[in-house]
Amino acid sequence: MAEVRVGENESLDSALRRFRRQCSKAGVLSELRKREHYESPSVKRKKKAEAARKRKYKYGR
């Protein structure tokens, strides 16, 4: 989890900006969206295969 300590002369806005940057680098929001609902292993495999198909089509042109 991202943790930010606010300095004495630091504004809350800049600390919040640092916190958001750390969260995005750590992938907190993407992990949250991924775990929002349970996905069975078969559904995960289907999604992974579909993403690979899309990538192959996109870069194959």
UniProtKB/Swiss-Prot annotation:
GO biological process: translation
Keyword Ribonucleoprotein: yes
Protein name: Small ribosomal subunit protein bS21
Gene behind the chain: rpsU
GO cellular component: ribonucleoprotein complex; ribosome
Comp. bias regions, Basic residues: 43-61
Segments of this protein annotated with the region Disordered: 36-61
Pfam families: Ribosomal_S21
Protein source organism: Caldanaerobacter subterraneus subsp. tengcongensis (strain DSM 15242 / JCM 11007 / NBRC 100824 / MB4)
Keywords in alphabetical order: Ribonucleoprotein, Ribosomal protein
MF-aspect GO terms: structural constituent of ribosome
